Amino acid sequence: MSIQVENIRKAFGDFVALNDISLNFPGGELVALLGPSGCGKTTLLRIIAGLEQADAGRVLLDGQDASATHVRERQVGFVFQHYALFRHMTVFDNVAFGLRMKPRRERPSEAEIARKVHALLDLVQLDWLADRLPAQLSGGQRQRIALARALAVEPRVLLLDEPFGALDAKVRKELRRWLRKLHDELHITSLFVTHDQEEALEVADRVVLMNHGKVEQIGSPAEVYSQPASAFVYGFLGSANRIRGVSATGAVAVGGQTLAADHQLPHGQPVEAFIRPHELAILPEHGAGLPARVQRVLTLGGLSRIELEGRDELAGQSFDAELPADAPLLAELAVGQAVRLQARAARVFAADPQGGEA
């Protein structure tokens, strides 16, 4: 089922949560609503579900205006961050709950309910836990049961609000791979809210990146990462060194040095250059580049992160560089050592005159 939101606006007092949002989600997609806390992503999800009413605008499900349709009539499955399982019910009864609550004329027989519940528990690979209580399950198992319960009523749309946010990093990684595989089997239109950039980029077909109640960019994970539409998008999607400077011909002047720019901006315009840690080369102090000093070297699995501080005109500016953990250069670096930095690539945006993100 397709979903469209048209000119949605929602405010809570003086706080504008959603400011004229229009989006189109084709049927069968798995879409991430990504952004920092307070950007409006959960409010948008709740409006689509019918759990919140928009102040203005429309929600269309398969082309039909559902703005005034009660949440029960929208045929939406909703999965919350904190499971929301009934503690006194077994896993089986939790999954069966929605089916048993249907109006009598629509309610399946107990035999049909049992068949369907066991099929769903088999789908989420937890049929062997059917007689357990939620307290006897791990966090990851509870979330899979919550998803099975949402699917039991055969929703036309599946909405997930930070479904893995309460889980530890290892379990989150396992579950997002599982969710992607499950979606590929079911092909149900699904939207999930997350503030985890890696989660959105790894799982989604498309990413909607939001900030301050507005949409910053929509695209595939590869598009939003490699072709960011704004400084906010670049800075939010992964680690980045951020340097203020002035545009020159095909370059950016920073601290008496020049960095090659990825595109032209008017000469002399204040700009911000963004450089990924793996695109920052560390050179001997007598070479050309940005003056810096090594502050710390950390080895994190197969990568080493070098934390540096700017010198001279860049005093007070922090930088991060990344190298393979077996890079020969690491043996030559010492805390306090003066070095030079050169960017292999830099993404340049016009600087926000207010000092924020452009």
Curated annotation (Swiss-Prot):
Predominant subcellular localization, coarse grouping: membrane
Segments traversing the membrane: none
GO MF terms held by the record: ABC-type sulfate transporter activity; ABC-type thiosulfate transporter activity; ATP binding; ATP hydrolysis activity
Reactions mediated catalytically: sulfate(out) + ATP + H2O = sulfate(in) + ADP + phosphate + H(+); thiosulfate(out) + ATP + H2O = thiosulfate(in) + ADP + phosphate + H(+)
Span of domain ABC transporter: 3-237
The organism's place on the tree of life at top rank: Bacteria
Pfam families: ABC_tran, TOBE_3
Record's bilayer topology term: Peripheral membrane protein
Residues annotated for ATP binding in this entry: G35, P36, S37, G38, C39, G40, K41, T42
Disulphide bond pairs: none
Compartments it resides in: Cell inner membrane
Enzyme class: translocase
A GO CC term attached to the entry: ATP-binding cassette (ABC) transporter complex
EC number(s) recorded for this UniProt protein: 7.3.2.3
This protein's UniProt keywords: ATP-binding, Cell inner membrane, Cell membrane, Membrane, Nucleotide-binding, Sulfate transport, Translocase, Transport
Family that this chain belongs to: Belongs to the ABC transporter superfamily. Sulfate/tungstate importer (TC 3.A.1.6) family.
Protein function: Part of the ABC transporter complex CysAWTP involved in sulfate/thiosulfate import. Responsible for energy coupling to the transport system.
Assembly behavior: The complex is composed of two ATP-binding proteins (CysA), two transmembrane proteins (CysT and CysW) and a solute-binding protein (CysP).
PANTHER family: SPERMIDINE/PUTRESCINE IMPORT ATP-BINDING PROTEIN POTA (PTHR42781), SPERMIDINE_PUTRESCINE IMPORT ATP-BINDING PROTEIN POTA (PTHR42781:SF4)
Official protein name in the record: Sulfate/thiosulfate import ATP-binding protein CysA 1
Organism annotation: Chromobacterium violaceum (strain ATCC 12472 / DSM 30191 / JCM 1249 / CCUG 213 / NBRC 12614 / NCIMB 9131 / NCTC 9757 / MK)
Encoding gene, per UniProt annotation: cysA1
